[in-house]
Each structure stands twice: as structure tokens, then as C-alpha cells.
Amino acid sequence: MSTNDNWYIEHFQPTGSAIGYRISGKLDEVQSPFQKIEIYQTTDWGKLMIIDGAVMLTSRDNFFYHEMISHPALFTHAAPKRVVIIGGGDCGTLREVLKHPGVESATQCDIDEQVTRMSEKYFPELCDSNDDARAELLFDDGVAYMANCPAGSVDIVIVDSTDPVGPAEGLFNKSFYESCFKALKDDGILVQQSESPLALLDLIKEMRTEMGKAGFQSFKTLPFPQPCYPTGWWSVTMASKQANADFAFRQADAQAKGFDTLYYTAHLHTGVLVAPPFVAKALGE
């Protein structure tokens, strides 16, 4: 990354590309025990959160990610009541999960409390549900939390992590996925952010392989736009314990969802289940 001439620029070595934001000032910086968190004011994209030099979110476009890591899985499950979010310290995913009235409890476990505190201060719109009676915010190791989670106690596990380096490295391997598999009920769903399908298809394939080794039998990778991330295109991957799951969703419920979204719709959900040919070929779909 670099900051010069009033621009914040993140370089993405795998594709020889970069993304930049014109900034008007630096608002805050915290070095937590785990990572460096910075907040900038941009001229056109609202506030910008950076973690260890990588863009995490902006005020203007975070809704793509938060809605797509939440609503497809929640509308795919028949009746999700107990949700666990690993990571997600900015609290945007928690907010989306708790838009579903049938959810009875949502536990968010992020290792770094400072991410949440910075989000509460600079992105309060993402933290609307932090005081919801159904919400539980924990600041602990997500790997350990899932390892100790009672068997068959969770409907959906959402892994809303940073890239598979540093504090998040342990969230992308067979051992962690085995813990998720154990904690999920038979009809449970695991959903994880799975990087850019344009630049990192090999990583997505590796993730799905590790999930399969842990016992998951069916997978679906959903691509979507995310302007602030490398290549501008991102994905989440859902995994099911069921063989040959088609990931059909409750379309009528999604159409009559009763809450506002900025990107997710039932029609969009239908379309995103059909992978682009190059993704389908690479992933064997």
C-alpha cells in the first residue's frame, strides 16, 4: 500500500493491479495486539477502513459484501434460528443476519475487539444491531470457539474473515472446517468469504477441497461485485453436509422478506446460483 498526493493505494501483486481512493485526511489509527487498523476520510466513498494495509470496507459499497455473505445462506436454510459469525468485527454481517425475524440468536466471535470499537465510532450504521437482545458479541479466537461449540447446535456458520494470512490464517483449513461440521446440525450451512473468482480461483478450489475433507459434500460459490476489493469482484462459498444439495432457496420468503436491502433480491439470488462458465468449469459445477 502507499499514500501519496492525497490518495490511498492498495497494490494487489497477484494481478499486477491496484485500487485507490482519494482521501481528505486520516481519522484514526490503532495498533491492536493482532493488527494495525486505520480509518481515512475519502472524498467520494465515505469512510475507509484499512487493516494491515488492505482495504476492508468503505461507507459507500460495503453493502454488497455484507448482504451476500448473509442473505443467500439464510434464505437457503429452511428455518435458521441459531447463527454463528466468526470474524465480522465491523458488525455489518451481524446487522444483516438480525434482519431475519426467525433468527433467535446470533453470536459474533472476532479475535480483535478494536475492529468493533473502530466500527462503532466511524461506521455506526453497521452497528445498529449490536444491542439487539438476540446478539452476542465475543472477542476471542474463532478457531477455539468453533472447536468448543456443542455438536449439532448451530444452523448457519458464517466465516466473515480477512484474507487467509495473519489472524485469519487458521480459518481456511481442514481442522477448522471439521469444527464447523461438528457444530452444524444435519441441515446446517457453512458460508465463508472466498476471495476473488477472477484472480484467486485456485484458492477457492483449495477451500472447497479442505471443506470436503472435513465432511461437507456439496458446495456453491456465489460471485458478486465488490468495488473496494481487488479485481472488483468477490465471492462467498456455501457448503452443505447433504450430498447433491442444489442450494434451492425459499424464493417466496426472499421476495416478501419485509426488510430493506441495497443489492440482494430474490431475482438476483436466482441468477447468482448459475456460475459463469469459466468459474463453473474450474470448480467442476
UniProtKB/Swiss-Prot annotation:
GO process terms (BP): spermidine biosynthetic process
Reactions mediated catalytically: S-adenosyl 3-(methylsulfanyl)propylamine + putrescine = S-methyl-5'-thioadenosine + spermidine + H(+)
Annotated GO CC locations: cytosol
Active-site residues, record numbering mapped to chain: D160 (proton acceptor)
Pathway: Amine and polyamine biosynthesis; spermidine biosynthesis; spermidine from putrescine: step 1/1
Record has Cytoplasm as a keyword: yes
PABS domain boundaries: 5-241
Task of the protein: Catalyzes the irreversible transfer of a propylamine group from the amino donor S-adenosylmethioninamine (decarboxy-AdoMet) to putrescine (1,4-diaminobutane) to yield spermidine.
Stated name of the protein: Polyamine aminopropyltransferase
Organism name: Xanthomonas campestris pv. campestris (strain ATCC 33913 / DSM 3586 / NCPPB 528 / LMG 568 / P 25)
Gene that encodes it: speE
